[in-house]
Design a protein with these regions (language model features):
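Short coil-to-helix leader/linker segments, especially the first N-terminal amphipathic alpha-helix
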Residues: 4-32, 202-204
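Conserved N-terminal subdomain of the carbohydrate kinase-like
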Residues: 13-20, 38, 46-183
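Short amphipathic alpha-helices and their capping/turn segments at secondary-structure boundaries
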Residues: 23-38, 171-174, 203, 215-222
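Structural beta-sheet core signal
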Residues: 40, 94-96, 213, 266
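Generic enzyme active-site microenvironment
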Residues: 41, 183-184, 212, 230
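Active-site metal-binding loops of divalent metal-dependent hydrolases
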Residues: 43-44, 187
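Conserved phosphate/ATP/ADP-binding segment of small-molecule kinases
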Residues: 191-272
Length: 272
C-alpha cells in the first residue's frame, strides 16, 4: 500500500514525509469521526462465479468445455464495499439503484440479512440489474489453480432516468450533515453522473464531512476536490502511461494537482 499527499515534513526524506503526512491526516480523520454512520453512493451489481473442470475442447470450435462443479453468487461493486464497512463495525448507508428483477431483489435480501442499511436503494421498474458472471476452470487432477475462461455481463444500456438520479442524490444530501464520511463508488454505470457527484462533494465540504472516492479511470473529473482517492496499482500504472510520467510518484503528483485531491491511496491488490 502506497500513499501520496501534498504535505512535507522537515527532517524526513520526501517519500517518508509523504507517508507520514498521509498517515497523520488519516489518523486525525478517524479521531474526528462523530458517528459510525458512513454514506456510500454508487453502482450496485451482482457477482457470479461458476467453477468447474475444463478438460476438453469443443468439437466444433477451439474453446474449452467447462463442466460446472459449483457456483457462488455475491453482491458486488458498491454493495460489496458496504458489506466491508459493516464488517469493520461501521454503520454503512448504501444509496444506489437496482432493477425490479430476481438479481436486484436477491441483492437486497443478501444485504439485509447481513444488517446493511438498504433504505437508500431505489428499485426501478423495467430495469435490469447488472450481473457479472465469471467462468473459472482448471484441469481435473492438476494442482494448478483456476483460470478465468470467460466473463459474461448482463447490463442495462438505457440511461437511468434523470428523475431517479435526482431523487437518489437529494436523499443522500439530506443525510450528509449527520454522517462521518461520504464514499463515492463509481463503476461508470450511471448512478454517479457529473452533476450529482459535484453536488454531493460540495455539500460534504460545507459540512466538513470527508469524501473518499473510488473512481472509474474514465470518470476522474467526478472526483474533483475529494479528500481521499483509492487507486489500484494497475490503474496508477495505466495513468502513468497516459500522462507520460516517468514514475508512479510523478503520475500521482500530477493527478493530485490536476484533480485537486488531498490524498491518493494506492492498493497493491493481494499484496496489500
Amino acid at each position: 500500500m502506497t500513499r501520496w499527499n501534498r504535505g512535507m515534513t522537515m527532517g524526513m526524506s520526501d517519500d517518508d514525509a509523504k507517508v507520514h503526512d498521509a498517515l497523520k491526516k488519516l489518523e486525525r480523520d478517524l479521531k474526528n469521526i462523530k458517528s459510525s454512520k458512513v454514506l456510500l453512493v454508487g453502482d450496485i451489481m451482482m457477482d457470479c462465479y461458476i467453477h468447474g473442470f475444463a478438460n476438453n475442447l469443443n468439437s466444433r470450435a477451439p474453446v474449452p468445455v467447462l463442466k460446472e462443479t459449483s457456483r457462488d453468487v455475491d453482491v458486488g461493486a458498491a454493495a460489496h464495499v458496504a458489506r466491508g464497512l459493516d464488517s469493520l463495525g461501521l454503520n454503512s448507508h448504501l444509496h444506489g439503484i437496482v432493477g425490479d428483477d430476481d438479481s436486484g431483489l436477491s441483492i437486497l435480501e443478501m444485504l439485509e440479512e447481513e444488517g446493511v442499511q438498504t433504505s437508500g436503494i431505489a428499485v426501478l421498474e423495467d430495469r435490469t440489474t447488472t450481473v457479472k458472471t465469471r467462468l473459472l476452470g482448471a484441469r481435473e487432477g492438476l494442482v494448478k489453480g483456476e483460470q478465468l475462461l470467460l466473463r459474461w455481463d448482463i447490463e442495462d444500456d438505457t440511461p437511468i432516468p434523470d428523475s431517479a438520479i435526482t431523487s437518489l442524490i437529494e436523499r443522500t444530501v439530506e443525510s450528509i450533515p449527520n454522517s462521518s464520511c461520504l464514499i463515492l463508488s463509481d463503476y461508470g454505470l450511471g448512478v454517479l453522473n457529473d452533476q450529482g457527484a459535484e453536488r454531493l462533494i460540495q455539500v460534504a465540504k460545507q459540512h466538513n464531512v470527508p469524501v473518499i472516492a473510488d473512481p472509474k479511470l474514465t470518470g476522474l473529473h467526478r472526483s474533483q476536490g475529494v479528500d481521499w482517492v483509492l487507486f489500484q496499482s494497475k490503474g496508477l500504472e495505466l495513468m502513468r502511461r497516459r500522462l507520460g510520467a516517468t514514475t508512479g510518484a510523478e503520475a500521482a503528483a500530477m493527478l493530485l494537482e490536476t484533480n485537486d485531491w488531498k490524498h491518493l491511496l494506492i492498493l497493491e491488490g493481494q499484496d496489500g
